[in-house]
């Protein structure tokens, strides 16, 4: 009882001593970080985001994002805050902001905007999350939750297992805002977009595109609606707010800029880049590094820039594939042991489909008491200057079947020589001029787009297949269409 009372007093003291004024509302609210700490958190988290997803190399598009972002930041409620804008090389349709002024757009979401005003509306929405300190507020709530778990863990041993709440970096990406925060960011998005001369009603039209795409995440990044739940009256509210702000700014013109935006994204990569790896018929191919290996049935593969993970559905079988550090087997083995607090049980040299390899059985130095033991196997494969590493981990009653599945994957690692797969290129957005009046479906047929992709392309263009389009209108199609 004394410990519980102490916890209540401690939390109350924190609540009383850490209130800060919200820059947007002017109200005081619980905030466990100062603005300087907020900026520091964003700066420390940014490298993790960049390392995980990569940055799109497109200087012209980046310059456009910087220009529009800085212009909008100046009319925001935190105009003195240094903002940073980046384009992530991810096909997932998302935009998000970290505390401290770090705003990210994926190439996936840029491909789905159909005019500059849609982009500006979402830009204002994300800047709104920063100016209203939504991310910092969510992070503060997590810190309070972590405090509660840490103190509670001295009472309950079982609770201790769940006390490892991740702090910065990728954890921030998966924070889910509430509908109240989303409504406020919609309001701020309309305000900021209107003040910079954009027709903010276009933002509502883009949210309809997001609805058609759905809110599910793809792999390691959530989609927009997964972390930005839609307020129930979003479309009507954005329209009403747009009218209010346009009346407040009678001397301002409000632009859409459709054609100029579409020309900016011409040749933008679309979808997954096959050169960085793709799965086809339960085989993972990596053309850039010229290898492939089979994927166990019903296991989930996630391909990130730094590693590939293959996970069994129960979560008790995990295969990690990446580039090892070290110039030889022993150096790579030592780095693996040191980095993961593991010990060597035994090792042996072997060959895998012509490659020199080493296999080692490992164990944890200090396994968690009361948990099922792990079986850990390391496989190192030498390929010229590259040292590939498989780390196979299994736990529970199904260790034998998990290990068998992972062994089949490792034993199937082979040199990729198929020219068609080696030369597979990323699909790209192509901006074309409509040749004749007709339905959008007819336009897609004119440009020989596969019928199986018509619905996808309608969403990409913010249209219905039955919509009428006029000759010379600009639309998006896809080049380098992957084989069906």
Task: Annotate each PLM feature.
Residues 1-19:
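Sec-dependent bacterial lipoprotein signal peptides
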Residues 19-287, 292, 305-307, 311-316, ...:
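A Zn2+-metalloprotease active-site environment signal
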Residues 40, 183, 294, 464, ...:
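Residue-level recognition of short, solvent-exposed, well-ordered loop/turn junctions
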Residues 120, 245, 301, 390-428:
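Surface-exposed amphipathic alpha-helical segments
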Residues 181, 421-451:
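Primarily a LysM-type cell-wall glycan-binding module
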Residues 336-386:
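Signature of long, low-cysteine stretches enriched in small and polar/charged residues
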Residues 396-400, 450, 463-466:
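Short solvent-exposed coil/turn linkers within tandem alpha-helical repeat scaffolds
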Residues 453-484:
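Extracellular LysM carbohydrate-binding repeats and other cell-envelope/extracellular binding modules
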């Amino acid at each position: 009882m004394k410990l519980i009372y102490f916890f209540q007093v401690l939390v109350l003291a924190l609540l009383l001593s850490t209130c800060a004024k919200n820059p947007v509302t002017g109200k005081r609210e619980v905030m466990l970080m100062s603005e300087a700490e907020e900026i520091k958190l964003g700066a420390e988290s940014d490298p993790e985001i960049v390392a995980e997803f990569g940055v799109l190399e497109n200087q012209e598009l980046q310059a456009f994002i910087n220009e529009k972002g800085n212009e909008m930041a100046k009319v925001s409620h935190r105009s003195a805050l240094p903002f940073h804008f980046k384009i992530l090389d991810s096909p997932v349709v998302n935009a998000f902001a970290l505390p401290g002024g770090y705003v990210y757009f994926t190439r996936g979401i840029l491909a789905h905007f159909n005019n500059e005003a849609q982009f500006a509306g979402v830009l204002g929405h994300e800047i709104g999350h920063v100016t209203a300190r939504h991310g910092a507020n969510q992070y503060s709530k997590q810190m309070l939750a972590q405090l509660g778990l840490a103190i509670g863990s001295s009472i309950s041993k079982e609770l201790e297992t769940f006390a490892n709440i991740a702090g910065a970096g990728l954890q921030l990406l998966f924070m889910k805002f509430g509908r109240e925060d989303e409504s406020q960011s919609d309001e701020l998005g309309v305000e900021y977009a209107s003040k910079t001369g954009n027709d903010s009603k276009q933002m509502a039209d883009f949210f309809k595109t997001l609805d058609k795409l759905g809110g599910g995440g793809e792999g390691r990044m959530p989609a927009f609606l997964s972390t930005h739940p839609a307020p129930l009256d979003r479309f009507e509210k954005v329209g009403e707010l747009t009218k209010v702000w346009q009346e407040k700014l009678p001397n301002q013109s409000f632009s859409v800029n459709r054609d100029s935006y579409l020309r900016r994204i011409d040749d933008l990569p679309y979808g997954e880049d096959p050169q960085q790896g793709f799965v086809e018929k339960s085989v993972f191919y990596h053309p850039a590094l010229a290898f492939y290996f089979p994927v166990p049935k019903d296991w989930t593969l996630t391909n990130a820039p730094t590693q590939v993970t293959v996970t069994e559905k129960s979560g008790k079988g995990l295969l990690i594939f990446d580039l090892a550090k070290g110039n030889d087997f022993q150096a790579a083995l030592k780095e693996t042991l040191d980095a993961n607090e593991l010990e060597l049980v035994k090792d042996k040299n072997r060959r895998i489909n012509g490659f020199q390899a080493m296999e080692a059985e490992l164990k944890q130095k200090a396994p968690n008491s009361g948990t099922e033991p792990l079986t850990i196997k390391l496989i190192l494969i030498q390929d010229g200057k590259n040292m590939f590493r498989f780390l196979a981990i299994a736990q529970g009653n199904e260790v034998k079947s998990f290990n068998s599945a992972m062994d089949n994957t490792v034993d199937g690692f082979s040199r990729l020589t198929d020219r068609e797969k080696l030369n597979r290129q990323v699909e790209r957005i192509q901006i074309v001029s409509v040749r004749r009046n007709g339905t959008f479906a007819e336009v897609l047929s004119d440009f020989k787009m596969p019928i199986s992709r018509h619905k996808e392309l309608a969403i990409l263009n913010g249209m219905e297949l039955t919509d009428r389009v006029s000759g010379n209108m600009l639309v998006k199609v896809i080049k380098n269409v992957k084989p069906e």
